[in-house]
Amino acid sequence: MPKLYIKTYGCQMNERDSEQVARMFVQKGYTMTDREDEADVILFNSCSIREQAEQKALGKMGLLAKQQRHRPHVVYGMMGCMAQSKKEELFKELPRLDLVVGTQKYHRVFEHVDGILRARQERRMDELQTAFSGTHVCDVAEEADSQNRIRDHLNPGVRSTAYVSIMQGCEMKCAYCIVPYTRGAERSRPIRDVVDEVKMLADAGVKEVTLLGQIVNRYGRQMETAGGKGGFVQLLEAVHEVEGIRRIRFVSPHPIGFRQDLVQAFTYLPKLCSHIHFPMQSGSDRILKMMRRPYRNETYLDLCSRMKQARPDLSITTDIIVGFPGETEEDYLLTRQAVEQVQFDNAFIFRYSPRRGTPAAVMENQIPEEVKEARNQDLLAVVNEIAIRKNRDLVGTVQEVLLEGPSKTNAARLSGRTSQNKPVMVDAAPDLAGEILPIRIEESTGFTLYGVPCPSRG
């Protein structure tokens, strides 16, 4: 029985896409493996958001191909955003590569791999030097309806959480971001199809779903409003009605299109988790304008305030870029000030990384790496201090925790998350995995909480 190995880089959307690909192969008789040296097909799902992610994927794929020269039958494929961006160029960088598949062609991966294998068998390519030739496939063309092809799941009955892709594409075109060029225009799935997928997951035992989109709150912009509610809130309400689903999350929204109906949803949809990941990117209006993010920081801060009024226990996490071209010390200090004002529960802080083909890559006044690093470390210290204090304040409280499964670092413990997306390690029996239980928080080690189940009553 042939074996498939998939390595995924980047965001939750990539993880979901990889799962769809894996499901297709398993349906055709493949088994999954976590060992590259026993795989017959090796696929990487790549990320282009930063250069480091691209270099990791390129380096790893090149190393694997060299290490396995004695296994000429293995098919090597690159999928995802880097595949979409670099296209045939990847065959020059990775001579052993067989397949390049773009972001709208995940549903074609199996047929391409199968075609490559059949071609090799027909030609009886037994010699190492000829086994690599004539099998290159590059499929990066746009395909209508591709957003509706990411709908199948791999073994949904063995876990309590799942990602659900509700749309693809992005049309905001921030100056630093390659995603609009790799993911295409915005395309939304019908509400009915999303709800059917969520029902299937609930029937399999899933209790928490995370709705995915490049800018998730722009879902269904072409839909008619109903009672003053846009398409995304209509979808949230429909998913909320699915029996068996206990928690709903969504990532990632954008201040543009973040309507009051979405703020209000936090007041009447109890399954909506008390957490939002809400990218700020900069606290400077001047830098936001240069980034082509068409809002003022005041708008962002006001949205944070209104969301916390709607859901007082809401935790807010964010993304921030430091060292964007032209960022002055004053601009950076405005970002630092905004972080202190919002009191984020956590933040991903990135040093600006030029991406080929984006407007920011050719802007003047590129910031020296040592300045980027200094600002990164300074802001990280501010964020960490806030996050550690907030977690410490939870010691002694009782939190509802979804126990997701064994801890990766200690199999004797279960790991889970609160509604606020705080990771919790729990001393609990393995058969409690998948349950949502009240957990007394006994310790905080900074970013991780530790607790025990509360005694059952009666």
Curated annotation (Swiss-Prot):
Q: Which UniProt keywords apply?
A: 4Fe-4S, Cytoplasm, Iron, Iron-sulfur, Metal-binding, S-adenosyl-L-methionine, Transferase, tRNA processing
Q: Which residues form the MTTase N-terminal domain?
A: 2-118
Respond yes or no to whether keyword Hydrolase is given for this record: no
Give GO cellular component annotations, separated by semicolons: cytosol
**Domain named TRAM: residues:** 392-455
Residues the record lists as binding [4Fe-4S] cluster 1: C11, C47, C81
- Reactions catalysed according to its record: N(6)-dimethylallyladenosine(37) in tRNA + (sulfur carrier)-SH + AH2 + 2 S-adenosyl-L-methionine = 2-methylsulfanyl-N(6)-dimethylallyladenosine(37) in tRNA + (sulfur carrier)-H + 5'-deoxyadenosine + L-methionine + A + S-adenosyl-L-homocysteine + 2 H(+)
* Note accompanying the cofactor annotation: Binds 2 [4Fe-4S] clusters. One cluster is coordinated with 3 cysteines and an exchangeable S-adenosyl-L-methionine.
Which GO terms fall under molecular function for this chain's record? Answer: 4 iron, 4 sulfur cluster binding; metal ion binding; N6-isopentenyladenosine methylthiotransferase activity
UniProt domain Radical SAM core: residue ranges: 156-389
What cofactor does this chain's UniProt record say it requires? [4Fe-4S] cluster
Subcellular location, record wording: Cytoplasm
Query: Entry's Pfam families?
Result: Radical_SAM, TRAM, UPF0004
Which residues take part in binding [4Fe-4S] cluster 2?
C170, C174, C177
Q: What is its EC number?
A: 2.8.4.3
User: InterPro entries recorded for this chain?
Assistant: Elp3/MiaA/NifB-like_rSAM (IPR006638), Methylthiotransferase (IPR005839), Methylthiotransferase_CS (IPR020612), Methylthiotransferase_N (IPR013848), Methylthiotransferase_N_sf (IPR038135), MiaB_methiolase (IPR006463), rSAM (IPR007197), rSAM_horseshoe (IPR023404)
The job of this chain, per UniProt, is described as: Catalyzes the methylthiolation of N6-(dimethylallyl)adenosine (i(6)A), leading to the formation of 2-methylthio-N6-(dimethylallyl)adenosine (ms(2)i(6)A) at position 37 in tRNAs that read codons beginning with uridine.
Q: Indicate the quaternary assembly.
A: Monomer.
Q: Please state which protein family the record places this protein in.
A: Belongs to the methylthiotransferase family. MiaB subfamily.
Q: What is this protein called?
A: tRNA-2-methylthio-N(6)-dimethylallyladenosine synthase
According to its UniProt entry, this protein's organism is: Akkermansia muciniphila (strain ATCC BAA-835 / DSM 22959 / JCM 33894 / BCRC 81048 / CCUG 64013 / CIP 107961 / Muc)
